[in-house]
Swiss-Prot record:
Pfam families: Fe_bilin_red (PF05996). GO terms for biological process: phytochromobilin biosynthetic process. Keywords: Oxidoreductase. Gene3D superfamilies: 3.40.1500.20. It comes from the Bacteria. Coiled coil: none annotated. It is an enzyme of class 1 (oxidoreductase). This is Phycoerythrobilin:ferredoxin oxidoreductase. It comes from Prochlorococcus marinus (strain AS9601).
């Protein structure tokens, strides 16, 4: 099933505009859709007690690029309690470019929002001053409207840049307004800047390519072992499917 034919392209899914912007912009850069195994590309399921079963939908969509992108994938979830857009671009390691990471989660009582250029090397080895200044300016503008969430632990923070947008919002009308307007604007600005940098980058030497490969492996292994979405996914789809999804699709190239 094409993701365009699913609920995730419809206005009643919280993150539909974000997903459409992703897919449309990646297609402009001649990215090619990657075939996802059918058991992960679309799944309908139920969760909850026998007396109050709820429906949940999951779709996984991915693309590659012949030179620039190893794998870019979106995982979308829709249910009465949870609505998730998780997106990651894994760049080719012949370019010194960070990951592009998105994690927008609607929980029963709140929203968790993360948007960043996530480093695969130390910040000083991957971000020049011009990029850092641009990111921090965009971040500060976003957080002039969206509250900044609590400080991340050092173990988690090492996988984020100084430009990370990180917010928690209550489920209320004001939050819907902020997501529809400020967050969507910031999301477009971040993605546009990222794709511009990725597609203008020059190839790096073999030694740096090895460092980038090791850095990506380190990040993906950490995410695979410590994915904070694991409990939610397990409650919706069961442990066996969740572990298979994490291992085979979410954090692999």
């Amino acid at each position: 099933m094409l993701i365009q034919d699913t609920i995730f392209y419809r206005p009643d899914w919280r993150w539909h505009n974000f997903l459409k912007y992703l897919t449309n912009n990646l297609s402009k850069y001649n990215c090619l859709e990657k075939t996802i195994p059918s058991e992960y590309s679309y799944k309908d399921s139920t969760y909850g007690s026998k007396k109050s079963k709820k429906n949940v939908n999951l779709s996984t969509w991915g693309v590659t690029h012949k030179k620039r992108i190893k794998f870019a994938r979106a995982v979308c979830i829709n249910s009465p309690n949870y609505s998730v857009l998780n997106f990651l671009i894994i760049p080719n390691t012949i370019y010194n470019v960070p990951f592009f990471g998105v994690d927008f989660v609607s929980l029963p009582n709140s929203y968790l929002l993360v948007l960043d250029f996530q480093p695969s090397l130390k910040i000083q080895n991957q971000y020049n001053n011009d990029l850092l200044e641009k990111l921090i300016k965009l971040k500060n503008h976003c957080h002039s409207s969206l509250p900044l969430a609590e400080k991340m632990s050092a173990d988690v923070a090492r996988f984020f840049s100084p430009g990370v947008i990180w917010s928690k919002l209550p489920k209320e009308e004001r939050s819907d307004f902020l997501i529809t307007n400020q967050l969507y604007t910031s999301f477009k600005e971040y993605l546009d800047l990222y794709l511009e940098i990725l597609f203008e980058s020059k190839e790096v030497n073999i030694e740096l390519q090895k460092e980038l490969t090791n850095g990506q492996i380190n990040y993906l292994n950490y995410r695979r072992d410590n994915d904070p979405a694991r409990p939610m996914l397990s409650s919706l789809f069961g442990q066996e499917f969740t572990e298979s999804l994490i291992e085979e699709v979410l954090f692999t190239t």
